[in-house]
């Protein structure tokens, strides 16, 4: 199955995803394929909380929303681990957020190799196609942080990867500096 021949219609996916959430299972629909998103573990939660603290300290005008669903173009529906947006950007919106409101999507890898491949390969393309300015990937398996920026033509023009322990500069419109030393505690 590809985006040219999806497994199902997006509306069918939305019905399945809504039912699954009631049973602690999260699905995503990326490039026309149904994906199971593993439930986050404690280390995952700590990384997301660390990012929330970093963003709130340096950019109090923005909010990092964990687990907000994003309606991407065509046959793509994702639930990033977090999205950075302006305060109240999602007020009066339903459960699926407009990607135009998202300044940065965040994914933290899990213990699932299929989900990790999706985070590393498919989601950068999906987020770039949607015009999300920055995609931040915290890769626990690789012990690295990758910042994707400058979306255009269905891909990110700038991709910078640094191992945990380095200072990571997240570019405009985010404009946040991350001291990733703490992430060494969470390498798998």
Label for each model-derived stretch:
Residues 1-130, 134-188:
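Gly/Pro/Ser/Thr-rich low-complexity, intrinsically disordered segments predominantly at protein N-termini
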């Amino acid at each position: 199955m590809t985006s040219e021949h999806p497994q199902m219609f997006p509306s069918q996916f939305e019905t399945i995803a809504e039912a699954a959430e009631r049973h602690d299972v999260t699905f995503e629909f990326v490039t026309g394929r149904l994906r199971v998103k593993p439930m986050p573990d404690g280390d995952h939660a700590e990384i997301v909380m660390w990012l929330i603290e970093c963003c709130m300290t340096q950019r109090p005008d923005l909010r990092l929303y964990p687990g907000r669903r994003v309606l991407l173009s065509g046959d793509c529906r994702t639930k990033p681990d977090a999205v950075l947006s302006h305060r109240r950007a999602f007020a009066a919106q339903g459960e699926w957020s407009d990607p135009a409101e998202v300044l940065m999507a965040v994914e933290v890898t899990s213990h699932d190799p299929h989900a990790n491949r999706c985070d590393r390969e498919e989601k950068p393309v999906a987020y770039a196609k949607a015009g999300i300015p920055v995609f931040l990937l915290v890769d626990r398996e690789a012990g690295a942080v990758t910042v994707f920026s400058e979306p255009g033509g269905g891909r990110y023009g700038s991709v910078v990867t640094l191992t945990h322990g380095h200072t990571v500069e997240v570019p405009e419109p985010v404009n946040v500096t991350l001291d990733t030393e703490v992430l060494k505690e969470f390498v798998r």
